[in-house]
Amino acid sequence: MKIVLVNPEIPHNTGAIGRTCVALDLELILIKPLGFSIDDTSVARAGTRYWKYVNISQYEDWNDFINTRKPPIEDIFLFEEIGQTSFYDAPYTKNSYLIFGSESTGLPQDILAETPDRIFALPMKNSKVKSLNLSNAATAAVYQALKVHW
């Protein structure tokens, strides 16, 4: 299982997600452009002393990622507020790619349009809240996915 961040903007979120990846022995995949330098001290600070243990891969853009990794469609899980299916009902696989967009704009529309049936949402009880912090959403999703395969 892998966590994929497409164009992350806030280093603290990426650092926190990196720490989660270390705790769960998952790969963290970053798709450029990034809103910070991967060597940024704020990324390492959020990941604390664990950042050096993050299994991290980077790709120049979405096409580079898709063409290099060639993930099967059944392993792709896009997380976005417009998802019609709850992340509780997603058919996770052991090789799932849990994919999240940037903090300000989410996943690009062209990515969402490629696989509209692979978009999942974290349910919100209160309609005043449309999304969660990226690191919180990624952590919630990965623990839900691992629940199926733990």
Residue ranges and their predicted role:
Residues 1-150:
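Post-transcriptional modification and biogenesis factors for structured RNAs
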